[in-house]
């Protein structure tokens, strides 16, 4: 029978005599040779056969040719022959010319053009396939045994072919001839469909069959292809598909069927669909995520397979303990945490009128311990509050929030407590001044206490003469004013003076002792006092001389150390062993007296040598890992403690190298430590050391409590003053100035790579993309040979186009960081694609100023984004500019507006036209402040005319307490007023 991989070409007649009972009429030559006869097969079925038995005559050359067989696309043909052969020894009285073999030939032709005499009956034009010999021959006619042989030939190129059989003197019968070819049947493998494919021209040929993903599947590796071998079998699969998100495998991985109701699949893959997590549902088939039910939400960081959760209920059992102008609040956790474990608390302080009808947020003088930073919240259920004023009425709201509170349209649940502070003594007098002095008196004044905590009744002044080993007898006087005249003093004498204020609560603390001196009797000061400037000047000059000498000694010493360091490194050894003048000249440029030079750890033949040279080895017994706080490229990031001998225990961040690492991964992991270990600056993350002599391998750095700058700003939207933000930017610029002076290019400067500690100090981190910058005055760039990804939104155009990374490209990135900081962590270029960003920057589009951004800061951003990198400011200039802005705070009050020109706004981000909204609620939804819709309605602000007249006090009164939200709503109200003025009718 015919196998599943073997069939005749479509539309052609099978070249077979098996089972044929009608006359075949094949061509014979000569006519006395092959003879067509009827016979029976093994099952005694009637068949037509060809036989020949001219064994008694020598020089036989009998040919038999089939009819024309269409080839179509087949390149190699297989022929199965069934035949019987008579044993020559069993035939009596025959000459030695008797044969027991015959020859198989084929002839290719584009048309059925063969005739009785054409082509010539000979090898060439006929092509010989093989000489066919039987496995068994028979000696008696009735016991003939059928032989089966299969031969193949190719490659074929014409439209068809003939088969021919040559007899040279055998006694045989040709029972069956079957021509066929082999193919690989269509199949599904790896969720891809591969079509039916014919085998190649040779038995060893491999034919490539391209595949396509089955419906609802996606490619996971390309190209998709299978190889069909010469036996018609598939082999060597390349590439694969997998079921798309929302679909699962079915029918033995031959189909991808949609997830049913109540199930979902968030990622592509071969896994099955999963039931919806609690509090969620699907609305259609093929769901990739289950939608949260009403009142339940997911945080942005929650995975799609996590349960939907709700906001927590209000804290319970608030207890207050008031002590004069400070208090302690304690409370119990909410009855319902909302199904989450990231519960936090916000304490809102409000100062109220006597009737508590009008409350406003407390000013910044009120201190909280632990300190509250915007929306980061408290984890402890206890807070100490100090520096509140005496007597006023206060209301404290303790809000319970969790990771999805920002998703809820309603304000957090809270418990409130009303507090009336007690009378407290005044604070200390900060400073005192000498107004005039005579031989027996002096007139003093002072600044009133910063916190009087009530009406000041009078001041008590204590003074005593300063003598050799101590002070004399103290005298006290009182004054109703913040000034006093002290009489009865000695001439040319020094006195120590202190002052304190008194209220009905009693005296406050004395001020710090301050020294004042009376004049001589003749009105002149003493000789010692007159010579004081000369003495001070001489001492200062002497001190400066000593400092200069010490600095010169240090410079010379460091110069020798740097030179020795360079010469002992692989870079230096290369210099000593090289006669290349260009190399020597470059190295000399690095060795600048008094300047520390960065050395690329990748120049070391042994990377471990760089680690030993620049990083301190720490014993594992000194390290204690407390919790995992994240995951990095090489392993986990943990928080822990470090206790070195002779030093106090400190919190540290610990990067660990995952198990099963390769030597290259270990080298790349430790290279960051080799880089960080060379830096020593308050705005660069500090390396404590490494652990390489035990497992796991660790890099230990200082711990930054507030983590990455971008997420920190988003959590504290609108909570900082402009001066605070500029201070952060100044710290980042100072760190980058330090790196650029060491000829070091960061290449990945972004807010996500700036870490913030508890004191809001920003430090540059993440040196994974950084590389050494060669100091070549002609072209001070590092040409990257890496093919890795680069952060398009933060990278300078020349670095994207030509992989030219310089300190100037870092300046471009710093401008983007400025924009991130002033926009409180907004994504640069918003939702534009990377290619759109590249095109826009190429067309001189630049980011517009963030909301409420000072003009001076946005201009500095634009300076950083100048196309010509040589015209961008240096980091030293940026630091100087920011210092001037900090000293002249008034310059930061001029707010930037979007202007046209070369550096025009990237996108039209104007506030929506309020006339397009039918209700105030629609307007609040448009500006993403829909959570306050109920507040506006309950307070009576139901029309745009009323909303346009609202002030910050109105927002506070109706419950909009977050400063960032107040600023956003007021900004939109201001635009609403402008639109109303533009649409007023004009009287003619």
Swiss-Prot record:
It holds the Pfam family Ephrin_lbd. GO terms for cellular component: dendrite; plasma membrane. ATP binds at residues 629-637, 655. GO terms for molecular function: ATP binding; ephrin receptor activity; transmembrane-ephrin receptor activity. Keywords: ATP-binding, Cell membrane, Cell projection, Developmental protein, Disulfide bond, Glycoprotein, Kinase, Membrane, Neurogenesis, Nucleotide-binding, Phosphoprotein, Receptor, Repeat, Transferase, Transmembrane, Transmembrane helix, Tyrosine-protein kinase. Disulfide bonds join 53-171. Residues 1-534 are extracellular. It is found in: Cell membrane; Cell projection, Dendrite. Present in 10-day embryonic brain and body tissues. Prominent expression in kidney. Lower expression in lung, and barely detectable in brain, liver, heart, skeletal muscle and thymus. Gene3D superfamilies: ephrin a2 ectodomain, Galactose-binding domain-like, Immunoglobulins, Phosphorylase Kinase, domain 1, Transcription Factor, Ets-1, Transferase(Phosphotransferase) domain 1, Tumor Necrosis Factor Receptor, subunit A, domain 2. Its EC number is 2.7.10.1. A motif (PDZ-binding) lies at residues 986-988. CDD domains: EphR_LBD_B3 (cd10478), FN3 (cd00063), PTKc_EphR_B (cd05065), SAM_EPH-B3 (cd09553), TNFRSF (cd00185). Residues 311-424, 425-522 form the Fibronectin type-III domain. The active site is at 748 (proton acceptor). Phosphorylated. Autophosphorylates upon ligand-binding. Autophosphorylation on Tyr-604 is required for interaction with SH2 domain-containing proteins. Residues 915-979 form the SAM domain. Residues 11-189 form the Eph LBD domain. It is an enzyme of class 2 (transferase). Its main location: membrane. SMART domains: EPH_lbd, Ephrin_rec_like, FN3, SAM, TyrKc. It catalyses: L-tyrosyl-[protein] + ATP = O-phospho-L-tyrosyl-[protein] + ADP + H(+). Belongs to the protein kinase superfamily. Tyr protein kinase family. Ephrin receptor subfamily. Heterotetramer upon binding of the ligand. The heterotetramer is composed of an ephrin dimer and a receptor dimer. Oligomerization is probably required to induce biological responses. Receptor tyrosine kinase which binds promiscuously transmembrane ephrin-B family ligands residing on adjacent cells, leading to contact-dependent bidirectional signaling into neighboring cells. The signaling pathway downstream of the receptor is referred to as forward signaling while the signaling pathway downstream of the ephrin ligand is referred to as reverse signaling. Generally has an overlapping and redundant function with EPHB2. Like EPHB2, functions in axon guidance during development. This is Ephrin type-B receptor 3. It comes from Gallus gallus.
């Amino acid at each position: 029978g015919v196998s599943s991989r073997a069939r005749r070409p479509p539309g052609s007649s099978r070249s077979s005599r098996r089972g044929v009972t009608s006359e075949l009429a094949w061509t014979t030559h000569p006519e006395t040779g092959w003879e067509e006869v009827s016979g029976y097969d093994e099952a005694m079925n009637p068949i037509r056969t060809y036989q020949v038995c001219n064994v008694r005559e020598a020089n036989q050359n009998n040919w038999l040719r089939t009819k024309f067989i269409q080839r179509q696309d087949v390149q190699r043909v297989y022929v199965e022959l069934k035949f019987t052969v008579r044993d020559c020894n069993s035939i009596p009285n025959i000459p030695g010319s008797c044969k027991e073999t015959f020859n198989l030939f084929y002839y290719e032709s584009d048309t059925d053009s063969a005739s009785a005499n054409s082509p010539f009956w000979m090898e060439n034009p006929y092509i010989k396939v093989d000489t066919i010999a039987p496995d068994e021959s028979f000696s008696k006619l009735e016991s003939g045994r059928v032989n089966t042989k299969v031969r193949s030939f190719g490659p074929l190129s014409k439209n068809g072919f003939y088969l021919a059989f040559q007899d040279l003197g055998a006694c045989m019968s040709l029972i069956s001839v079957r021509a066929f070819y082999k193919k690989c049947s269509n199949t599904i493998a790896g969720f891809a469909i591969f079509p039916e494919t014919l085998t190649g021209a040779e038995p060893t040929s491999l034919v490539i069959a391209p595949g396509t993903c089955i419906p609802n599947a996606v490619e996971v590796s390309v190209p998709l292809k299978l190889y069909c071998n010469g036996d018609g079998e598939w082999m060597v699969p390349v590439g694969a598909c997998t079921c798309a998100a929302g679909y699962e495998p079915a029918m033995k991985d031959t189909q991808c069927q949609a997830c049913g109701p109540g199930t979902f699949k968030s990622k592509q893959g071969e896994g099955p669909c999963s039931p919806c997590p609690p509090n969620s549902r699907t609305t259609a088939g093929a769901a990739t995520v289950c939608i949260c039910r009403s009142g339940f939400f997911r945080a942005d960081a929650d995975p799609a397979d996590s349960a939907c959760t709700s906001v927590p209920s209000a804290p319970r059992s608030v207890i207050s303990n008031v002590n004069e102008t400070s208090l302690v609040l304690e409370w119990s956790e909410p009855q319902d945490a909302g199904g989450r474990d990231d519960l936090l608390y916000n304490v809102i302080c409000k100062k109220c009128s006597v009737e508590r009808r009008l409350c406003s947020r407390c000013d910044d003088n009120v201190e909280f311990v632990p300190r509250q930073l915007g929306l980061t919240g408290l984890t402890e259920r206890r807070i100490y509050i100090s520096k509140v004023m005496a007597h006023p009425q206060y209301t404290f709201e303790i809000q319970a929030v969790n990771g999805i509170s920002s998703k809820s349209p309603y304000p957090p649940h809270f418990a409130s407590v009303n507090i009336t502070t007690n009378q407290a003594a005044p604070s200390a007098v900060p400073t005192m001044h000498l107004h005039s002095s005579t031989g027996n008196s002096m007139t003093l004044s002072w600044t009133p206490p910063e916190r009087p905590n009530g009406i000041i009744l009078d001041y008590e002044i204590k003074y005593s003469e300063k003598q050799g080993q101590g002070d004399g007898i103290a005298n006290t006087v009182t004054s109703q004013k913040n000034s006093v005249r002290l009489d009865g003093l000695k001439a040319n004498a020094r006195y120590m003076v202190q002052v304190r204020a008194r209220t009905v609560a009693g005296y406050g603390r004395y001020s710090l002792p301050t020294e004042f001196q009376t004049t001589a009797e003749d009105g002149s000061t003493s000789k010692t006092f007159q010579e004081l400037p000369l003495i001070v000047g001489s001492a200062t000059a002497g001190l400066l001389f000593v400092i200069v000498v010490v600095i010169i000694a240090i410079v010379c010493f460091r110069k020798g150390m740097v030179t020795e360091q360079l010469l002992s490194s692989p870079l230096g050894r290369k210099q000593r062993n090289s006669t290349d003048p260009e190399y020597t000249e470059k190295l000399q440029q690095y060795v600048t007296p008094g300047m520390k030079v960065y050395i690329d750890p990748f120049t070391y033949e042994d990377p471990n040598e760089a680690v030993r040279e620049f990083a301190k080895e720490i014993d594992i017994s000194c390290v204690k890992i407390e919790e995992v706080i994240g995951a990095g490229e090489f392993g986990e990031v943990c928080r822990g403690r470090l206790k070195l001998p002779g030093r106090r225990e400190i919190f540290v961040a610990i990067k660990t190298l995952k198990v099963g690492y390769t030597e290259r991964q270990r080298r790349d992991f430790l290279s960051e430590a080799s880089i960080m270990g060379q830096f020593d600056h308050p705005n660069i993350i500090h390396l404590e050391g490494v652990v390489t002599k035990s497992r796991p391998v660790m890099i230990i750095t200082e711990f930054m409590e507030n983590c990455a700058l971008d997420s920190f700003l988003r959590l504290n939207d609108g909570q900082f003053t402009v001066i605070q933000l500029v201070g952060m930017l100044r710290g980042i610029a100072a760190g980058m100035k330090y790196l650029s002076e060491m000829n070091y290019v960061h290449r990945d400067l972004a807010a996500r790579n700036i870490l913030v500690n508890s004191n809001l100090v920003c430090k540059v981190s993440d040196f994974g993309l950084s590389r050494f910058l060669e100091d070549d005055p002609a072209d001070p760039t590092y040409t990257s040979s890496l093919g890795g990804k680069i952060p398009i939104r933060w990278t300078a155009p020349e670095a994207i186009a030509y992989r030219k990374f310089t300190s100037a490209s870092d300046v471009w990135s710093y401008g983007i960081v400025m924009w991130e900081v002033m926009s409180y962590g907004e994504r640069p270029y918003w939702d534009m694609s990377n290619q759109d960003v590249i095109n826009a920057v190429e067309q001189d589009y630049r980011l517009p100023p963030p909301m409420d951004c000072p003009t001076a800061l946005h201009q500095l951003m634009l300076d950083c984004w100048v196309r010509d990198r040589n015209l961008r400011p240096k980091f030293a200039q940026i630091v100087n500019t920011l210092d001037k802005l900090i000293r002249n705070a008034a310059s930061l009050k001029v707010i930037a507006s979007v202007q046209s020109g070369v550096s025009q706004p990237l996108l039209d981000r104007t506030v929506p036209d309020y006339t397009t909204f039918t209700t105030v609620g629609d307007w609040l939804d448009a500006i993403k402040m829909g959570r306050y819709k109920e507040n506006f309605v309950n307070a009576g602000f139901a029309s745009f005319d009323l909303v346009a007249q609202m002030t910050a006090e109105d927002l506070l009164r109706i419950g909009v307490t977050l400063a960032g939200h107040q600023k956003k709503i007021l900004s939109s109200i201001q635009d609403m007023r402008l639109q109303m003025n533009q649409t007023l009718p004009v009287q003619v």
